[in-house]
Amino acid sequence: MVNNKKTIKEIADIWKEDKRQYVKQSTMAVYLLSLENHLLPVFGGKMEVTEEEVQAFALDKLNHGLSQKSIKDMLIVLKMVVRFGEKQGWLNHVEWKVKFPANQPKATLPILTKAHQKKLMDYLKDNFTFPNLGILVCLSTGLRIGEVCALKWSDINMDTGLLHVNRTIER
């Protein structure tokens, strides 16, 4: 029974505060990015979400170059919000089953050539800023940006020239 209907955005705002106490900060950051950048612009004003709308959303994201994995992760967040709203009595929810095309080609990422990498690294060295330093460390070590952002001085052994990666953060 639905009483006091709410929009998906209203439900998501309440869900975020409830969910925050049960998940790590980095997990919550991923949920919030998914909501703000993808889900709420499409579903935020709606009082219910149909299978047809979710299917159209998934295909649109796929056509814009997102991977099935990324889209499935977004749909997990949407499902958590919708189920939360249903549990609170703010909306009715009928389970959806989203289908993805069977022969979706894998997206290929462009890779820097050695010459382009050297040119970029020279630029970063000649134009020092802390963000440029982070990019330079990524290019030089193969670390991910979240690993570089989480580095502490204690992770760097100047005697041996070793860098110890002990944590990561979500930007």
What is each stretch, according to the model?
Residues 1-2, 92:
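A short N-terminal helical cap/helix-turn-helix that marks the beginning
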Residues 2-5, 97-99:
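Short, basic/polar amphipathic helix motif occurring as a linker/hinge flanking DNA-binding modules
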Residues 3-84:
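Short, Lys/Arg-enriched alpha-helical recognition elements, typified by the DNA-recognition helix
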Residues 68, 72, 87, 91-92, ...:
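Basic, Lys/Arg- and aromatic-enriched nucleic-acid-binding interface segment
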Residues 161-163:
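Hydrophobic residues embedded in beta-strands of well-ordered beta-sheets
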Residues 166:
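Radical SAM [4Fe-4S] cluster-binding motif and immediate context
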